[in-house]
Amino acid sequence: MKNLLITIIVASYNSKDYILETLESCINQQYQNIEIIIVDDCSSDNSVELIKQWCKEKKSTSPKIRCILVESERNKGIPANLNNALPFINGDWIKCIGSDDILLPEAISEFVNRLEKCSNLDNIGAVFTYFQTFGYSVNVSTRYPSSWTRTICQMPPSWLKKAAAMIHFNN
């Protein structure tokens, strides 16, 4: 099971202030059998240029990790933007994150370790920590804002098996 390829899809839109930190958190995983697909939803800031430069640098420093950028021709919103990644996925499992999200270094290795104990799953939910940074201080919230309640119930942060994703999103 340790040979699973994990695809991390990063949904990006006008994310110049956060995207590099997000991408670094993806590539700095303890589990290294990953590919990173960034889907940009027609950003109007310089996000795309930053992403292209980052991918170019990582090709030389981390050549085993595939990193590609998929650019949308027009802004279509998050679901359609994520769907743009489907033709490029090679991984056995998919992790979708936003361009302002951070993966802890052990996130993928813990997932793969847990999957070894329960290998017949198609979807795995997860919890997350909501935080905001203001200068040098970090305020961590253990309670979800009430405006997120509906979103959390509908689509918790999760891992999705590639086969299940292809069946669900292509029908």
Residues covered by each model-derived region:
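Nucleotide-sugar donor-binding/catalytic module of glycosyltransferases
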Residues: 1-171
